[in-house]
């Protein structure tokens, strides 16, 4: 025994030493040595090199050929085919799959559009190993035979969302609809999920308890809120505040919140048969290689079935956990609820009467019965006056409740899919919903080359400057977010509230520009017998005309691509509050930065470039071009390193790298810098941190040097136009 102990100790010591050696021999990033260095990694994510599919693979085309009904039938078979390695509660995987789909979509947040069902990110670290996603690794493995069968014709992202719908339908619920179109990612998203370094901790609130920055979940590793209550405090009213804040930051109003919680908790059960600290192993990301991606191995009892331990809460909410009913609401309002503890020690709630002790069937043993349970977050629905009123109205009107849940579920799973033009399949609802940011369908012939040339001439003769036209086109198109495909030039919402009031868009000057463009549009459309042009198209065309003028003045003849076909949205089609989150608190391309920004100016530039799906060279070319065109939001000369503003040249890079200029911070200013002639001491330029980072950051300086070379001016113009066009058509899913 003594020898075995010694041997075990030696082996353990060797393993620890080996692990430490391997860790020490791993390459270290620049951020390891210099944590404050600007990180360009977000602009390199999701490279084509990560994607194993052929470059000519068209997912939309493959999906449209798919027999969706056959896929649904295959999913339906899986639902009631319980597997020994992970037995189904109540003989039905439906509730399990609903949780999987919900948690895949539920990471979405409105403030930056990140998270959500798109990409199938639940397959990757860190999401697949979040505490709130405990045991969902098994749900995806149950679906693997279906994914394997249909291959690339249906993405994991679409399959997960579809499975949630099929699960609901199999349990008697009528869903609102389904759309495919979510292409899979092949690597994890790089997302700021919070400042914490440990799961289930909360360092993300201000002094008033509000979440900071773009965050929506209340703790690291949770999808929404702590079901026990804020920081484990089982106070229903405090929980209601967290629920409203968290779900609200995920685009849900009070009615949708109540419908989702009540509807979701109509099905299935929570799992807390054992104490996690005593029974449950590490999450998938930390599990041994032989586990093959499985995590949370349970060493107590059978490890699954009746011994399953997930959240630590235990029990079902309703008497029929695999059927759609109003029983959740009936139980919530019929009983008085008192606190108790699950077998795992988590605080939950049960009725205060013994008459409820045997209402709920056991998930695996037909001879056992239980009392229904509620989380603190369920009791919050009853205790919060506004939530309660909605829940009571649902209880009185089951049809209203069912439709509300159906619509909220559809919104949850489709919020990050983008405009309806991206929706695929034959189950897309006909109703157009305002949260889909609707734009009228094209209903007229578009302008031809001759019309375009004439309109360009009219625009340039209107008295609008290059700066006016470039800034307006940029303001319109750069509202786009590649995270959830919202915003962009299509719809001309730059002409509507709230975008026409945003400080970054210089509202007074914007109104003057749009007024002149409106007149040009109306004049053309009145005279034209067939072709029409929208304001959305004319704004983009104005930017193209201005850039071509600036290119010509630089001595080149490059043309800016333009594809008509945009339409104009109305104010009625625009949810002002919903669009409010698209407002830029910083836009380094226009040298704009406000105190409301949660990152430094340079970091905000990277974030903006990431939202616009730009690469590092594209971002660099655009910043250099915008400075040459003197396109600062406030009309200032910061970063306009040229003697010929308005001419598209590489002067920004040439003068930034000029060694005859010495830079220093402007006295009494943390946000501005001054560039002086080293010999004369004369002030030559002023700059922001965004301008100077292209000379201080080694990677950005390398690209700046490329564009500053004597033979690179035409290449710079070509690259600027290509990057500009990319931004202008980011939202043109009709031509992609």
Curated annotation (Swiss-Prot):
Q: Which keywords, in A-to-Z order, does the entry hold?
A: Heme, Hydrogen peroxide, Iron, Metal-binding, Oxidoreductase, Peroxidase, Signal
Q: Name one Pfam family in it.
A: peroxidase
Q: Which residues bind heme b?
A: 265
Under Enzyme Commission nomenclature, its number is 1.11.1.21
Q: Where is this cross-link: Tryptophyl-tyrosyl-methioninium (Trp-Tyr) (with M-250)?
A: 102-224
Whichever gene encodes this chain, its name is katG
Cross-referenced CDD domains: catalase_peroxidase_2 (cd08200)
Show the taxonomic lineage.
Bacteria, Pseudomonadati, Pseudomonadota, Gammaproteobacteria, Alteromonadales
GO CC terms: cytosol
Which pairs of Cys residues are joined through disulfide bonds in the record? none
Protein name, entry field: Catalase-peroxidase
Q: Which family does it belong to?
A: Belongs to the peroxidase family. Peroxidase/catalase subfamily.
Its Gene Ontology molecular function terms?
catalase activity; heme binding; metal ion binding
């Amino acid at each position: 025994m003594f020898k075995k102990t010694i041997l075990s100790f030696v082996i353990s010591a060797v393993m620890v030493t080996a692990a430490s050696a391997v860790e020490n021999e791993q390459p270290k990033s620049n951020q390891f040595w210099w944590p404050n260095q600007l990180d360009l990694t977000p602009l390199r994510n999701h490279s084509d090199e990560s994607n194993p599919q052929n470059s000519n693979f068209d997912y939309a085309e493959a999906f449209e050929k798919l027999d969706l009904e056959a896929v649904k039938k295959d999913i339906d078979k899986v639902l009631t085919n319980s597997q020994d390695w992970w037995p189904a509660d109540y003989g039905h995987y439906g509730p399990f799959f609903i949780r999987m789909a919900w948690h895949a979509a539920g990471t979405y947040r409105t403030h930056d559009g990140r998270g959500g069902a798109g990409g199938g990110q639940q397959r990757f670290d860190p999401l697949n190993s979040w505490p709130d996603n405990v045991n969902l690794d098994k749900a995806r493995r149950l679906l693997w035979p279906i994914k394997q069968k249909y291959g690339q014709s249906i993405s994991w992202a679409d399959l997960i969302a579809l499975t949630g719908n099929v699960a609901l339908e199999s349990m008697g619920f009528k869903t609102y609809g389904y759309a495919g179109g979510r292409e899979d990612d092949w690597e994890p998203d790089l997302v700021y999920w919070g400042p914490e370094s440990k799961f289930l901790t909360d360092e993300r609130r201000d002094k008033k308890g509000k979440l900071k920055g773009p965050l929506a979940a209340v703790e690291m590793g949770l999808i929404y809120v702590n079901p026990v209550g804020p920081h484990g405090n089982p106070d229903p009213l405090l929980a209601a505040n967290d629920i409203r804040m968290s779900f609200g930051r995920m685009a849900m109003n009070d009615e949708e919140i109540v419908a989702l919680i009540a509807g979701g908790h109509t099905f299935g059960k929570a799992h807390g048969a054992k104490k996690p600290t005593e029974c449950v192993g590490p999450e998938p990301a930390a599990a041994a290689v032989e586990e093959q991606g499985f995590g949370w191995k349970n060493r107590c009892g059978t490890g699954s079935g009746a011994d399953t331990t997930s959240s630590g809460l235990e029990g079902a909410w309703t008497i029929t956990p695999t059927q759609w009913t109003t029983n959740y609401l009936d139980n919530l309002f019929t009983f008085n609820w008192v606190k108790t503890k699950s077998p795992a020690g988590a605080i939950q709630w049960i009725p205060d009467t013994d008459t409820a002790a045997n209402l709920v069937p056991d998930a695996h043993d037909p001879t056992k019965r239980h009392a229904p349970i509620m989380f603190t977050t369920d009791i919050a629905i009853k205790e919060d006056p506004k939530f309660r009123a909605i829940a009571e109205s649902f209880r009185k009107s089951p049809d209203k409740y069912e439709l509300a849940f159906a619509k909220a579920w559809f919104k949850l799973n489709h919020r990050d899919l983008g405009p309806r033009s991206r929706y695929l399949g034959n189950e897309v609802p006909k109703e157009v919903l305002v949260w889909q940011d609707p734009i009228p369908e094209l209903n007229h012939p578009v302008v031809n080359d001759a019309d375009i040339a004439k309109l360009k001439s009219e625009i340039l003769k209107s008295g609008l400057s290059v700066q006016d036209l470039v800034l307006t086109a940029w303001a319109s198109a750069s509202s786009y977010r590649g995270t959830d495909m919202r915003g962009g030039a299509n719809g001309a919402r730059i002409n509507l509230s709230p975008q026409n009031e945003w400080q970054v868009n210089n509202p007074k000057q914007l109104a003057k520009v749009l007024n002149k463009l409106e007149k040009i549009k109306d004049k053309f459309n009145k005279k034209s017998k067939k072709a029409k042009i929208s304001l959305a198209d004319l704004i983009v065309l104005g930017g193209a005309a201005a850039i071509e003028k600036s290119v010509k003045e630089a001595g080149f003849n490059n043309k800016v691509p333009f594809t008509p076909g945009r339409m104009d949205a109305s104010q009625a089609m625009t949810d002002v509050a919903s669009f409010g989150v698209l407002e830029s608190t910083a836009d380094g391309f226009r040298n704009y930065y406000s105190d409301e920004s949660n990152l430094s100016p340079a970091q905000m530039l990277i974030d903006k470039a990431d939202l616009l799906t730009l690469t590092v060279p594209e971002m660099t070319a655009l910043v250099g071009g915008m400075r040459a065109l003197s396109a600062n939001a406030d009309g200032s000369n910061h970063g306009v390193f040229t003697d010929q503003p308005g001419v598209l040249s590489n002067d920004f890079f040439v003068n930034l790298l000029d060694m005859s200029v010495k830079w220093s911070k402007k006295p009494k200013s943390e946000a501005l810098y001054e560039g002086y002639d080293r010999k004369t001491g004369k002030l030559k330029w002023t700059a922001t941190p965004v301008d100077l980072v292209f000379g201080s950051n080694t990677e950005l300086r390398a690209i700046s040097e490329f564009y500053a070379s004597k033979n690179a001016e035409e290449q710079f113009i070509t690259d600027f136009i290509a990057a500009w066009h990319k931004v202008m058509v980011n939202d043109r899913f009709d031509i992609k």
